[in-house]
Amino acid sequence: KPKKAIADARATIAECIGALPEEIYFTSGGTESDNWAIKGSAFSDPYKRATITSSIEHHAVLRTCSAIESMGYPVTFVSPNRSGIITADALEELITENTRLVSIMFSNNEIGTIEPIKELVAIAHKHGALFHTDAVQAVGHIPINVQDLGIDMLSASAHKFNGPKGVGFLYIRNGTEIKPLNDGGSQERGLRAGTENIAEIVGMA
């Protein structure tokens, strides 16, 4: 029964964002998901080490980027225009062949802007970079289809769409190379160690 409950919840969450069930990894929330996406990407490629994010991200992203920067991983910050939008042209000016990850939030938690994710994904992929979006403010409120948008990773937190606190997920597109954040057991297909919080996972779905 517990395994079926988790599997059913995984399928429900996947359907909400246009993903496959095996692309959904349960976490403790948006902050863990952001940490995992950013650190897991940086640590996974010894040759492409740089990360680009925006100057108006949530602290979960900004402080994680500061952490990897202190470890010697280059981080560049792209600024929004006067309307609070990260434009494709602004990203194009900063991205290089050394860029491993571009991380831009889906919608801003303070000013409410919705970023042109599909355009930004296209720029990232043109240069061989992965694209992650912190969609904590968007999931459950804005229609999202990760396949249509081309997103590689997406973070979400249940309490932002009327679910319980302390649970969330990271969408990781099949084939994306990422290192685990935690060492330990084989939960979440060996990528996220730690006993699953079944009650909250079910509550999220």
Q: At which residue positions do the language-model features occur?
A:
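Pyridoxal 5′-phosphate
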Residues: 1-205
